[in-house]
């Protein structure tokens, strides 16, 4: 019996199918490898840094450098980023700049070749070496450091890199453009340091509005976990515990010339833990106004007044979005001034708001009341035979608070040495307030 031979072309077709199958498998494996390589290539790198969303915090032992490198380089379409200093920590050794893709994470940005960085602790620029040159001012909590590449640099092999502080240009430098691009980097070097990273930040134009923002910043003597934007204060802290207080304290204390200020709640945030009041100049940055000695404050969330204690007393109504809270001092006529240049010239100030009119009326009533009782007070002092404590003599005042133009209450207080400074505290995420430190001036 004769065997039937299979056609040769059938065997060849099966071999072709088998080869195609293996080629397809190899192709799929190759695609997977390419994707893995690309995923690894565009992956953020960090060491001794704790990353929580856009928040970076130092997570090393004392003396160890912490370094973070973003996953993608700056491009012509995205040529700028910013870093907000949430907490400057023990030494404030925070660096912001640009580095090559595989930069060593054991060194601060700017220390090694082909990298550059602006260092917050000394205001110096480090450009490829561990020795920096004076570049700008030092940066603290609440400040924003920006870094970018001029768009024209992407068309050539030389990068013109510029830095900003709080939206205003500080200076620029030139360095070679790395083949893989220059990546945003943040360095830290001491306990407690924490920043917020804004990779999609935009640099606004330096116009009159920027100059106005800078002038408002000059009114503040201390800022902790608070950002200033014109008259607006924004909370930048974590809002997770009672020590995450954002504090803003005015540069100058209240006086007989400027004795009142106001705060409007723009955004109550998560809990509306907003407080305004008065505090001594060296008031702790992690304590809400009113909680520690040398301070008194009205708290929006519960309507209580706190006077040098963590326990408040019922005082007034709660405050919500859109409410205007005010605080001022009624100075007696025998008040001992800190400086000879201060006088009660504020009687002739121009009144601009209902709140201000109410404040003026209360002040006048107080003076009239005081003049009518001066003789009685002197007689009582003679009968009692008691002397006023030296540190209290001539320093006693009445602190008052307002809500939407109405005075809601008063509190006797003794002005600490150096004066009572307008102080605002915030303690929950999203809180924003608008401040007017001089509502009685016209």
Curated annotation (Swiss-Prot):
Q: Where is this region: Disordered?
A: 371-394
| Bias (Acidic residues) ranges | 372-390
Q: Which Pfam families match?
A: SPRY
Residues in B30.2/SPRY domain copies: 17-204
InterPro entries in the record, alphabetically? B30.2/SPRY, B30.2/SPRY_sf, ConA-like_dom_sf, SPRY_dom, SPRYD3_SPRY, Ubq-SigPath_Reg
Superkingdom per UniProt:
Eukaryota
Instruction: Tell me what this protein is called.
Output: SPRY domain-containing protein 3
Instruction: Please give the organism.
Output: Homo sapiens (Human)
């Amino acid at each position: 019996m004769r065997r039937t031979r299979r056609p040769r072309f059938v065997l060849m077709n099966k071999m072709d199918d088998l080869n195609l199958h293996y080629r397809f498998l190899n192709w799929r494996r190759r695609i997977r490898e390419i994707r893995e390589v690309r995923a690894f290539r565009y992956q953020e790198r960090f060491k001794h840094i704790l990353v929580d969303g856009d928040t970076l915090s130092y997570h090393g032992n004392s003396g160890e450098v912490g370094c973070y490198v973003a996953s993608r380089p700056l491009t012509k379409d995205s040529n700028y980023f910013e870093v907000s200093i949430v907490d400057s920590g023990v030494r404030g050794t925070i660096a912001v700049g640009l580095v090559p893709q595989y930069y060593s994470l054991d060194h601060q940005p700017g220390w090694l070749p082909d990298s550059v960085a602006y260092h917050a602790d000394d205001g110096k620029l480090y450009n490829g070496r561990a020795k920096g040159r004076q570049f700008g001012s030092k940066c603290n909590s609440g400040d924003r450091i920006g870094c970018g590449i001029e768009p024209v640099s992407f068309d050539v092999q030389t990068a013109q890199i510029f830095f900003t502080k709080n939206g205003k240009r500080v200076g620029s430098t030139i360095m070679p453009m790395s083949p893989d691009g220059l990546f945003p980097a943040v360095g830290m070097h001491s306990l407690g340091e924490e920043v917020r990273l804004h990779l999609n930040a935009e640099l606004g134009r330096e116009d009159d509005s920027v100059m106005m923002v800078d002038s408002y910043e000059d009114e503040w003597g201390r800022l902790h976990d608070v950002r200033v934007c014109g008259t607006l204060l924004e909370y930048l802290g974590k809002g997770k515990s009672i020590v995450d207080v954002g504090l803003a304290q005015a540069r100058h204390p209240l006086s007989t010339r400027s004795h009142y200020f106001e705060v409007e709640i723009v955004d109550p945030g998560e809990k509306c833990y907003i407080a305004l009041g008065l505090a001594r100049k060296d008031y702790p940055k992690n304590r809400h106004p009113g909680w520690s000695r040398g301070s008194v404050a009205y708290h929006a969330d519960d309507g209580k007044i706190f006077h040098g204690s963590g326990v408040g007393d019922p005082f007034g109504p709660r405050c919500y979005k859109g409410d205007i809270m005010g605080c001022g001092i009624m100075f007696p006529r025998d008040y001992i001034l800190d400086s000879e240049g201060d006088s009660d010239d504020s009687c002739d100030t121009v009144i601009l708001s209902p709140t201000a009119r109410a404040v003026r009326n209360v002040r006048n009533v107080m003076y009239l009341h005081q003049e009518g009782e001066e003789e009685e007070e002197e007689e009582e002092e003679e009968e009692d035979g008691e002397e006023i404590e030296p540190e209290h003599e001539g320093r006693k005042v009445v602190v008052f608070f307002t809500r939407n133009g109405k005075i809601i209450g008063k509190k006797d207080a003794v002005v600490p040495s150096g004066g009572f400074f307008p102080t605002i505290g915030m303690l929950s995420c999203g809180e924003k307030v608008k401040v007017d430190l001089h509502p009685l001036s016209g």
